[in-house]
Amino acid sequence: MLAGAPGTGKTLTAEVYAESEGRALYSVQCSQLGVQPEDLEKALLRCFARCGRWNAVMLLDEADVYVHRRGDDLTQNAVVGVFLRVLEYQSAVLFLTTNRAEDVDDAIASRCIARLTYAVPSPADQARIWRILADLSGIRITDRTIRAVVARSPALTGRDVKNLLKL
């Protein structure tokens, strides 16, 4: 499970893992699976079957609705229950991303082999991100300019930097 603010590298982690293993990444948006328990179960089983056929790594992006801590909402509880039941019998490598790690159901969290939390980059890390992405994009930018941008916008994520360099 990969948790953190948007743009901090969760999806990139799954992409890099799949590439390093020489496997395809099957990225699934939660909106594709539905929120009704019976629809979710069928859709998840289809996705896992595809991963098996393709030997793919699965990324379930923004999985918050399926991993949310159970409470008084019976439908939500059923969704989490279906998700748990389907996961229990799968062998595929699955990356789940969430922006709300504090709300993850304990039963889901206990089934995750690894849980990584991503923070907004520190100013020093942000400067390194600027340098690396600018160099990869062939954009000439001085270290002085990078320091000035970081000083004025210390909460930018890697995705923010990437998008700004496209301007």
Predicted regions span which residues?
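Walker A/P-loop NTP-binding motif of AAA+ ATPase domains
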Residues: 1-147
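C-terminal helical "lid" of AAA+/P-loop NTPase domains
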Residues: 150-151, 159-167
